[in-house]
Amino acid sequence: MALVALVAGARLGRRLSGPGLGRGHWTAAGRSRSRREAAEAEAEVPVVQYVGERAARADRVFVWGFSFSGALGVPSFVVPSSGPGPRAGARPRRRIQPVPYRLELDQKISSAACGYGFTLLSSKTADVTKVWGMGLNKDSQLGFHRSRKDKTRGYEYVLEPSPVSLPLDRPQETRVLQVSCGRAHSLVLTDREGVFSMGNNSYGQCGRKVVENEIYSESHRVHRMQDFDGQVVQVACGQDHSLFLTDKGEVYSCGWGADGQTGLGHYNITSSPTKLGGDLAGVNVIQVATYGDCCLAVSADGGLFGWGNSEYLQLASVTDSTQVNVPRCLHFSGVGKVRQAACGGTGCAVLNGEGHVFVWGYGILGKGPNLVESAVPEMIPPTLFGLTEFNPEIQVSRIRCGLSHFAALTNKGELFVWGKNIRGCLGIGRLEDQYFPWRVTMPGEPVDVACGVDHMVTLAKSFI
């Protein structure tokens, strides 16, 4: 540091020793400039900080995509700077955030979900506040958020992560395990007090009786569901329906059934969670997936089952019908045992035991612009996820689906995305659609990801 300051001082002396500068001028103005420039030079010297071997990596949350709904939780993206005119340094509004942006949060987030223009975050904390919401709230899918100007009114847009109140009996003992979001409703899964639902219940998707002409805007209503044969271990919101998986491996559903997405053998609405039968009868299910109107389920022995909408060939391997109202076993050759499934609006994906990703349906499926539709799964080349002869151990460990895009996490902590890049939802720095997996760069290691319609949220760990 001293050497840098000495060099800076010598350079300064040479500049000030020119004609017209006397000794008094050097003493008064030159000395202050010398100190200032020496300080600036010292500040430019890189500082190396060493991290201990036992230092904990910090939790991070990154968001990107369309911001004007408030779903990204960054108010400055939505609200213009206050004041009569532009201020120096004021940030302009940002309609689209095309690359990952770090969301400043004090809480350790364990689950995230993206709805149609809104976001839920949850933590397994023992604190009273366990869930935070942001974004569109016209159906109270984020709960009631009281207006600061009028205490009797609530916000229809929540621009920053705000606490969601849950009617917990034992708030310091109960933990929130997972959140899920649909088009205008939300589910919150707890470990001790069942499942809570909020938002639009026009089709019974919140698991309660449909009330004619019910007003959902600025509603305080949070419904609790506990009438399951077993403990619910996973929830999944479709567009206007809900799925519940219990620790007994059984699947329950409620909500809109016009495409058969409730899987209950009819096409009507169902306002109370009801157990599915069909080919799922007696099957031990370990995961359910839905987001649009098609549903998939994975069994413990690696089997795959599907029901609901099949207009885009999602279930064309077993039926010509475009609506399937009971679960059907999908016998796909060459896929192997299925570990995970993801289901969007028109496309589906599964991950097998070898870490390979298979896609089918309609749209941008991930194998280039020539593959537009397929009734049977097509494997995406593992090399597109980073597999090489120098990195032979790389494989995909987790898959997710938004309405029209996909995401995959690898065992090396890398996130790949592909599909329709609606309002920059892929986070790849440009707005064009992506026809094959592309790695998303961010200052952290992704551990989980949530996909919406036009935005995404990633939970990550700091590198050091």
Curated annotation (Swiss-Prot):
| InterPro entries named among the record's database cross-references | Mitochondrial_GEF_domain (IPR053035), RCC1/BLIP-II (IPR009091), Reg_chr_condens (IPR000408)
The places in or outside the cell where this protein is found are:
Mitochondrion membrane
- The superkingdom listed in its UniProt entry is Eukaryota
GO MF term list: GTP binding; guanyl-nucleotide exchange factor activity; RNA binding; rRNA binding
Placement of RCC1 repeats on the sequence: 58-124, 128-191, 193-247, 248-300, 302-353, 354-411, 412-461
Task: List GO BP terms, alphabetically.
Answer: mitochondrial fusion; mitochondrial large ribosomal subunit assembly; mitochondrial small ribosomal subunit assembly; positive regulation of mitochondrial translation
The keyword RNA-binding is assigned to this record: yes
GO CC terms of this entry: mitochondrial inner membrane; mitochondrial matrix; mitochondrial membrane; mitochondrion
Regarding tissue, the record states: Ubiquitous.
- Which keywords describe this protein according to UniProt? GTP-binding, Guanine-nucleotide releasing factor, Membrane, Mitochondrion, Mitochondrion inner membrane, Nucleotide-binding, Repeat, RNA-binding, rRNA-binding, Transit peptide, Williams-Beuren syndrome
Q: What Gene3D superfamilies does its record include?
A: Regulator of chromosome condensation 1/beta-lactamase-inhibitor protein II (2.130.10.30)
Read off the transit peptide span from the entry.
Answer: 1-37
Annotated domain remarks: The RCC1-like repeats assemble into a circular seven-bladed beta propeller structure. Each blade is composed of four antiparallel beta-strands with loops between each strand.
Q: What does this protein do?
A: Guanine nucleotide exchange factor (GEF) for mitochondrial dynamin-related GTPase OPA1. Activates OPA1, by exchanging bound GDP for free GTP, and drives OPA1 and MFN1-dependent mitochondrial fusion. Plays an essential role in mitochondrial ribosome biogenesis. As a component of a functional protein-RNA module, consisting of RCC1L, NGRN, RPUSD3, RPUSD4, TRUB2, FASTKD2 and 16S mitochondrial ribosomal RNA (16S mt-rRNA), controls 16S mt-rRNA abundance and is required for intra-mitochondrial translation of core subunits of the oxidative phosphorylation system.
User: Which disease is the protein involved in?
Assistant: WBSCR16 is located in the Williams-Beuren syndrome (WBS) critical region. WBS results from a hemizygous deletion of several genes on chromosome 7q11.23, thought to arise as a consequence of unequal crossing over between highly homologous low-copy repeat sequences flanking the deleted region. Haploinsufficiency of WBSCR16 may be the cause of certain cardiovascular and musculo-skeletal abnormalities observed in the disease.
Subunit info here reads:
Forms a regulatory protein-RNA complex, consisting of RCC1L, NGRN, RPUSD3, RPUSD4, TRUB2, FASTKD2 and 16S mt-rRNA. Interacts with 16S mt-rRNA; this interaction is direct. Interacts with OPA1; this interaction is direct.
Name the UniProt record assigns to this protein: RCC1-like G exchanging factor-like protein
Tell me what organism the protein belongs to: Homo sapiens
Source species taxonomy? Eukaryota, Metazoa, Chordata, Craniata, Vertebrata
